[in-house]
Amino acid sequence: MKRILLIVILFLTAMAVFSQDMTSYKDEFMRTDGTFDERLLLLEAVRDAGLTGIGEFYHDALKYFIVRAPDIRTTTDRNAAEKSAVILCQGLGAEKYTDAAGEIWQIVELFDVAGDATDGNAMQAALIALGQVNAQDFVPHIAQRLSNFNTQSITNPETRRRVQMAVVGSINALEALHDIRGYRPVFFVSVGSYDPSIRQIASTALPNIVDDPGDVSIEIIRDTSSIPSVKLTAWNEMLRTRAPDTSKARVAAAALEMGWTYNTTNEGYRKNLSDMRKGAIDAIRQFGISDDSVYANLELSYSRNFVNNTPDYDEIVKTLNTLTAINTPESVAILYKFLQELNGRRRNGPWANKERQLFEWVVSCLRRTGTQSPDVRILLTTISRTDTYTSQERIMARDALNTLSGTR
């Protein structure tokens, strides 16, 4: 029987190469007495013939395949059916046959890797095909499936293998569909407990899903359930995008804010938050101020380090340079406030190496702003004439004042 069928298939293949008439194939595939093995042989012949423009055939065949799915009873039937589903989905994907999206999704459900008897190939092929046929209506379904995988804790190696096949299919689909709703679940694959190769696939896909995932990035950074390492990764991923500067500035503001509002005693997490703050401060210098809340958080990056016994001088320098580069009345006012505080310390103490270093940096920053603020000029004049300062410190203040006055 199989030999006769194969001869018929080869004959039909030769006909189809020249005519592209798939009627005979369709009739043979839909024989009511056909087996899953026989249908698989026919599909393999179609695939190997390299025919094109046959999306309608694949679609009709898939519809019939779904109708006959309840007939799957044995392991042999299931293996042949899964291989057939792969060929059908790959064919529809290659043809970009959008009308078949609904049936392709049924294959996702029919061969869900949650079933122990399913290998994972068919589900992966179906998910990939959904991206290829531009199945926009199914973005929420794919994103939800991927989110569900992200929340699972899987210890069985075989189950893990099958799930990761479906995860790769989901990533591929969401990358192809370019919808922001796919960004969050793919991001959480990149920071999840999957194999490194799977996480890398997700990370590589992220910049291709949407140009500007700013809103989603802010949600992840502000999410109280996201640990600092995840927040830091979300921030760094935002920097890799093609988002406009205004969007990156908004996310930078959120990253800086969360870097100060998230409380933890975990040293690793505190390092994550510090790195996120410093990256955000650099970005604000580059992309600008998105809202006035940034000023208060920049001030925190200076003041909290100022009172710390082990200050992060790198964060202080980045903050001062950013305030100088922004050069708005608000940023100059903050620099002026810093100098006022240092002036108070010079009079009343303590005044040690830390204060001397900060004094030098703040005076230099005010000089570089070119500000014409009367308050700044008066304070610099006072410092230049106060004996409690060293001659070097008074000279620094005088030089800054002369620069602002345009005399040097």
Describe every region a protein language model picked out.
Residues S193-Y194, T388-Y389:
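Short coil/turn segments at helix-helix junctions and helix-capping linkers
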